[in-house]
Structures are given as C-alpha cells and as structure tokens.
Amino acid sequence: MMANASGTGQAFNILIVGQSGRLQYEAVLFAASLRHSDPGFAGRLFVAEPQPGPLWRHDPRITDPAVRTLLTDLGAEILPFDSRAFGETYPYGNKIEALSALPEGEPFVFFDTDTLITGPLSQVPFDFAKPSASLRREGTWPSIELYGPGYGAIWKSLYDRFGLDYPTSLDLGHPDEYWQRYLYFNAGWFFYRCPRQFGARFLSYATEILSNPPEALVCQTLDPWLDQVALPLVIHSLGGGRQTLPPGLLDGSVSCHYRTMPLLYARESDAVVAVLETVAAQNAVKRVLKDHEPFKKMIYQPKGVAVRALFDRANLPRREQVIRNTIKREGLWVR
C-alpha cells in the first residue's frame, strides 16, 4: 500500500540509492528520519542497490549486514538494479538507471540519499502530472568561457537537439545571460507520475548528451553535471517546470538535502539539527551509524558542535565553497 498525497488523492513511492561506502549509512539515516518525521507514511520506500557487473570494478552492493537488517526493520525495500550505461565511471547515473526498477505507472519521489526528512512528507501536495525538481542550487553549469557561447546558446542547442520548445523554459524575470533565466535544477529530488517513463527519457537524453553533445558544449565538462544538464530537459518535455509545489516544503520544513554532515551543522536550522540528533540517538540507529567515521565524528563525538560555532546562520557566506574552506581550515571537514 502506498501513501496518499494530500491535495492530490494519489499514492506514491520513495526512491533513494544505497550501495557500499557512505551511501549505505546515509540510507539508514534517511529511512530512520522518514519513520520519525512522518510516522503516518504508508508508502513504499525503495533503496535501489546497483548490482555487480561489467561497469563496476568492485561489488557496489551494501557491504554492512547491519545496514541491510536495519533498513528492512525500518520498512525499506532493497531493490536491485543493473547498471547498463554508467556504473563506476559516473555513479550519479545510478539515480537515472534505478528508475527502471520501480513499479510502472506508480508515482514516485526520488531523493538523494544525503537527505533528512524533517516533516510529514505524506502531506506534501505533489502534482505528479507536473514534474519538478530542487531549486536549491548554484549556477554550477554551464561554465561560460570568454570567447565561447553564452548561456542562451548552450541551453538552446540542447532544447533544439531534443525537439523541445526553448522559449517557454525561460524565466523572463531574470535578464538575458543570467544563469537563473534558464531552467536548471539540483537533482537532489524530483518526482513524476511514472518512474519508467521518466527514467527512460532521462537515460535517453543523458546518454545522447554524453555521446553526441551539441557543438555549443565543446568547452563544457559534463562530469559531474550530466544529470543536472539532462534533468531540466526531461522535466520540460513532460510538462513540468519550476515550483510546481508550494514553496517551503521540500528543501524547507519537510526535507533537508544536507550533502555532508559538516555542511548540515554549518548552515541548517536548529530544527534540522534537532531531528538529526533525535533520530541518531535511537539505539538501533546509533549502533549502525557509529561505524561510519564522518557520522561518528560529527554527531557522536561531537565535532558538529564545533563546526556550528564557526558560523552565524543569519549571515552565512553566499557561496558554499567559502563554507567548505572555512571548515577545512579548522580541520573539521569529513565526508
């Protein structure tokens, strides 16, 4: 049985990726925070697990048996999938390829695994016919060269490649050649009414961009930005766009894409830290998370308090890199 989304009458599944290394521990924290913050969520939480194959040099599956057991105890379903296009050379592609393993025709919400659920997700009024994604981002792509094409030429070349209407994607509230004028998301969350339709288009667009980029992309790097280059094209092609959700819910009161523990302690609200520390204090969760050194240091030692003391949340540096560099100078950066 899946949860009903308030305001839509539709049910939905949740997808995150879990594999060896830090993502397996982040998956535990995600699942535990979902259970804590939305105990009424009756849906299915899928933890997609890439399987060994020719695109992986090492076994990518979850290595810690305690993680696997706890995820199941928290109500998650571990969902194997095969890597046919990306694998180890582009692990961000897991979010693209995992979509094909979800139940067809059932609405889904994808979250990056380094996300904390902080409120009742089941009450978010998703309109699954109008896909969208996170606007908590910086202008990371494209990188404009002095004598190269500008934002408009680069993005238009991509819309033209896939036969999409470019002008309707623009936010005319921003000036020409300013990055926010162009449809650009953080791929930390996105949603749609059918994962397989979304995933097939995402895979098609991403692989085409990678193997046969338009000439305007000649100066651009696609690693690690490929998913965020293809995502706005997919969303626009499926009738979605910016802010098809009420503001302040995802990336607000209901979810926090923390990225790393030092960044969470540096910039997130007291409410987010309270959810983190309440969830992490549960004995079953604590026993598992302490095996991941960054969580052990930040949450339990607790170095996160020292990171938090470095910053004024009411006056944070505008650029994330400045925050990262400050933490690194103090010897407190871990991931």
What positions do the PLM features span?
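Short, surface-exposed amphipathic charged segments that create phosphate/polyanion-binding patches used
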Residues: 91-98, 148-152, 260-264
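A glycosyltransferase accessory/donor-loop signature
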Residues: 2-19, 171-188, 193-335
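Conserved donor-nucleotide/metal-binding helix-loop-beta segment in metal-dependent transferases, i.e.
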Residues: 117-157
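Charged, glycine/proline-rich intrinsically disordered loops and linkers
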Residues: 56-71, 146-174
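Conserved glycosyltransferase catalytic-site signature
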Residues: 24-28, 92-96, 187, 224-229
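A structural signal for short, well-ordered beta-strand segments and their strand-loop junctions
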Residues: 46-48, 109-112, 117, 133-135, ...
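N-terminal anchoring/stem segment of glycosyltransferases
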Residues: 1-85, 104, 222, 297-335
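A conserved donor-nucleotide-binding helix/loop in the catalytic core
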Residues: 81-111, 116-119, 123, 133-136
